[in-house]
Amino acid sequence: MTQKISTEKEAVLDAETRMREDARSRRVVLVCHCLLDGNAKVWERARYSGDFTAVTDIIQKKGYGILQLPCPELLYFGANRYWGGKNVFDSAGFRRFCREKARETADYIENYNKVGVKAVCVLGCDGSPTCGVSHTNFYDNGGGRPKTLMRRVIPGKGIFMEELEKELKERNLPVPDFVGLGMDLFSDSTEAIVEEFRKYMEGK
């Protein structure tokens, strides 16, 4: 009996030691779904075959966790969806769906926040109608008979990013930096985009 109690005490002490030696960084980066899976991109918009390794390597070298955000477009419109601008996608139903996904994402941040895990940033995809951060897109001639659409890049967040920021503010949670990689702008090279992100992460 004495031996059993001694073994149980040793097990408790061993567990406490492991907890003290916990290696987690207490830092996490929330990453736009398609940056971790190019298969989620709308057709003809993927610049990489799988994940955007050059970007994920930067995050992993810092020792930070990566939380993959949902892709509202893929879930709502499907994998074989047409290209679309923010003005085309911004229906009451799709915005409500984005808000639901924003609430789920905010739950992660809220739970992390309670135990001291910091969301370093939200990494979006500039030029996306849903996950753009500083720039989204707009189609002047959307709707009606199928045709070639005239695409414009305009300042502002995509629908999901708007709803996520709004949800965090409504919960009085810390709002992390929203950082946009210009992967859907096609004005900068992939190398330039990666270098800009690398410099940003140096200070994080």
Regions found by a protein language model. Name each.
Residues 45-89:
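Short, surface-exposed acidic-centric catalytic microdomains
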Residues 30, 66-70, 118-125, 177-182:
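A structural signal for short, well-ordered beta-strand segments and their strand-loop junctions
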Residues 32-35, 70-73, 125-129, 135-136:
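Short loop/turn segments at strand-loop or loop-helix junctions that form parts
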Residues 1-45:
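Active-site and ligand/interface coordination hotspots across diverse enzymes
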Residues 121-142, 149:
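Internal, conserved structured core segments that host functional sites
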Residues 41-52, 145-157:
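Glycine- and acidic-residue-enriched helix-capping/strand-helix junction motifs
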Residues 38-39, 76-78, 128-134, 186-189:
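Short catalytic/ligand-binding loop motif for oxyanion handling, primarily in non-cytosolic enzymes
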Residues 7-10, 15, 24, 62, ...:
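Divalent-metal-activated hydrolytic enzyme cores
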